Amino acid sequence: MRILFAAAECAPMVKVGGMGDVVGSLPPALAELGHDVRVIMPGYGKLWSQLDVPSEPIWRAQTMGTDFAVYETRHPKTGLTIYLVGHPVFDGERIYGGEDEDWRFTFFASATSEFAWNAWKPQVLHCHDWHTGMIPVWMHQDPEISTVFTIHNLKYQGPWRWKLERMTWCPWYMQGDHTMAAALLYADRVNAVSPTYAQEIRTPEYGEQLEGLLNYISGKLRGILNGIDVEAWNPATDSRIPATYSTADLSGKAVCKRALQERMGLQVNPDTFVIGLVSRLVDQKGVDLLLQVAERFLAYTDTQIVVLGTGDRHLESGLWQMASQHSGRFASFLTYDDDLSRLIYAGSDAFLMPSRFEPCGISQLLSMRYGTIPVVRRVGGLVDTVPPYVPATQEGNGFCFDRYEAIDLYTALVRAWEAYRHQDSWQQLMKRVMQVDFSWARSALEYDRMYRDVCGMKEPTPEADAVAAFSIPQPPEQQAARAAAEAADPNPQRRFNPLGLLRRNGG
């Protein structure tokens, strides 16, 4: 099966959030199943020096009133084909932000549609988040291409209807309120990045004002859990941590713990309970809860806390103040360092994720891979990946709390600290979480089933019927001219017009 991924990120070249991990790791897992999988993304300025990109493009075209070119290169790790959309609007180091962000990604979606119709035609075009939300709108009338849309974070929804009309001349009834809504309506299949998140977004609490539409399309909505690259994140072979270890020999984890304490300026003590947090410092991630409970928790226990990340100024200020007041026990590193993040995963005893909402979460999977026990709020993908630990039966993977309240987080942290004092059962818990399968191979099988389902769909969905009702029929004379043109040239180059209808060049 020919599958084209369209996304704004692809790890390791471009990674801002979890979407980059998915687009970088899922395609090779699908390729292992025999699919021809390729990725198309904007040609950001930094990519031309990172990748071996030929000077000549493989294809040139025009859309939204401007020329663009598509260059073919290879993924540096997997060797899969990567297509870069070249245009001056993507020059420079910027990935997101700027006054022209809406135009940039709407243009990318438009260019991708042109490329999929006329250059390399996939059977499935897999779109990711609002940046590619207009692709299903423009593709919905092509019976040869099925579209899948993945929701990584429903909170970010793209440009609104009035702006899309100005940029694309696409009428309001083909858009929804914004690009996210348009994709939800027109994509043949929609998936969220965890089963629980797929259910949560259908409620007012997590639906970001789209719960009505999500309930309407629930027949084509599903949740598929993300995975991790188990080869790149393997404590038994990781050359970027001070000592390797495995379930057969955990002694290397103590070496990593000592190295972490030394690196972060903490008091070196192998018996101290160390909690790590690696995250964007935003309200979604629950950092405000940590600041509310840290002082009391440090006073009650001999715990040390390590935080790595960057984000909102008020949260950074609070973490800096906490580190100043509790030197040697609370350390915050207000930037992002990949090597240090690995050391935190390997050297901590527990990993904190008190998220307000969490579509899937990758950090808790990485922490368990390194034998670090997660302390999480039961929300989104954290529900699917971290069942509560029950000491009496030795079941579960971590310590959980339900309400977004400081007292609930405090109670979960105390339970983790008390469990750590019973080292025999704690060691069993470490070994168990290290053996859980969170590989992309497992997730790829679920995506494979979804792709086969959408390509085998013979009857249109109710949503497709509703969309077809808005299609504008051609006058009889145009239909006759089109039939004559098709008889003369059965394989024309096709383009989309602002109404989302397929047409011929010059037609």
Curated annotation (Swiss-Prot):
Pathway given in the UniProt record: Glycan biosynthesis; glycogen biosynthesis
Catalytic activity reported: [(1->4)-alpha-D-glucosyl](n) + ADP-alpha-D-glucose = [(1->4)-alpha-D-glucosyl](n+1) + ADP + H(+)
CDD domains noted in UniProt: GT5_Glycogen_synthase_DULL1-like
Residue spans of biased composition, Low complexity class: 477-494
EC nos: 2.4.1.21
Keywords recorded for this protein, A-Z: Glycogen biosynthesis, Glycosyltransferase, Transferase
Region annotated Disordered, chain positions: 475-507
GO biological process: glycogen biosynthetic process
Disulfide bonds: none
GO molecular function, one term: alpha-1,4-glucan glucosyltransferase (UDP-glucose donor) activity
Residues reported to bind ADP-alpha-D-glucose: K15
Sequence similarity: Belongs to the glycosyltransferase 1 family. Bacterial/plant glycogen synthase subfamily.
Record's function text: Synthesizes alpha-1,4-glucan chains using ADP-glucose.
PANTHER family linked: ALPHA AMYLASE DOMAIN-CONTAINING PROTEIN, GRANULE-BOUND STARCH SYNTHASE 1, CHLOROPLASTIC/AMYLOPLASTIC
Protein name, entry field: Glycogen synthase
